């Protein structure tokens, strides 16, 4: 499905002078499925410097459902590119989940919050190993991945339980095997 999708400027309903800072900064990338340029120039940065709870909420709540379902998005830690060849990804791998379209928006938004809040894994070791999350559309479902910097953390039971994200059939793929 080729269409122009834009992210509206995040807004908040109230003015908040105090920012609740995240432990790390994040960057949200976008890549159209029809784009065959897999170099970094083929990606668009939708928002960088995602460094506060307020920015996370505003961005996540203003991301259109169609963008989540029909384009490729990559939420990565600041300084890590959305490519497995990145030195901080190369020795790692990813969990790969199949999520039907009916639940994609709900699952993606929950994972987005948990990743930014360093709570996607059930312990600090898992959370610090997580480099990002990605979504890729297919016909009636999407593939959502959790990218890790190493391949020591291959137990999907150590990932936070998310409704409609089943651990049955989840695969762990080492990036070097791609």
PLM segments and residue spans:
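A generic structural signal for alpha-helix starts
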Residues: 51-54, 103
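Glycine-rich loop/turn
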Residues: 20-48
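Conserved NAD+-utilizing ADP-ribose enzyme module
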Residues: 1-18, 23-25, 42, 63-178
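Short active-site loop/helix that positions an aromatic residue
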Residues: 54-65
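Generic low-polarity alpha-helical segments
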Residues: 47-52, 162
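Short helix/loop capping segments that flank catalytic or ligand/cofactor-binding pockets
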Residues: 37-38, 58-59, 155-156
